[in-house]
């Protein structure tokens, strides 16, 4: 689920607002064009936009998912971690019988991905602490998204921005897991199994591999694989990916996704066109994203207690947390008191002038 081009190219695209076609290899998309259809954004919206108390309101969801004008937090790895395999669950390829990599090497790559995403998940939990003061009241300066959020590399100070950024990066990776791995798909039954047609596990979401709250080694099925990726992504593989399962052979990155329902149609990659592989990958990514959002809420409760976590979740989901979530900070209460006092003073002055005139 990522744009397969250099980070410098991505920066130029954003600056120019001209989304030129990307290189032939692409992941679940973050842009519109070149075969991509903002797949990450639409998956995230399908997973987390709903009318309930624990769902994200429009402006907040736009910051997390993107809105067509920017990547959003979930697209950030395609801007700053485009060449980091662990951020996209790449390079965990393996095939039984005379393969150039061992099962242990593939499992190590999966583990590296999980540990990377655990780090992002834990950072989101950590940054949520900055949403509230020591009394559990919302700090308005930390929760408003006016003007958008700056990239983490530019020192964005607001707790809501940074918590959403870290969680979005974790979501990017778990969504990529379904697009880039054999977890949810199946091989083409009309062709022999091999590096160009690896076996699929056809398993549902959520995946036991993606235990982001855990600390132990993930349980990796013996036939699980993700694709080897190089810039010249092809079948058969070239360079370090020669004789290996490649991203080009295994990905189910592109197609149309309904941002409201998650319905997936018109798959755009060879593996995605096999059976219902693209739809399975999208469904898996939607289900997993919802699961990780529940996991984040549970992690906040474990870390901060039920009362503080409840206010944190409200602050992370609502567009106007000081008004909607209660528990205003001392600064907000003082400002409200001052405004009320001024109002009473004006009323009193008007009444006094009226009596004097009489």
Locations of the language-model features?
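N-terminal, motif-rich segments that launch catalysis or mediate targeting to/interaction with membranes
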Residues: 24-168, 176, 180-326
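Bacterial N-terminal signal peptides that target proteins for export
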Residues: 1-9
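Catalytic PLP-binding core of fold-type I/II PLP enzymes
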Residues: 172
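C-terminal segment of classical bacterial N-terminal signal peptides
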Residues: 16-24
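Juxtamembrane/start-of-transmembrane alpha-helix segments at the extracytoplasmic/lumenal side
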Residues: 327-339
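C-terminal membrane-anchoring or membrane-association module
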Residues: 343-358
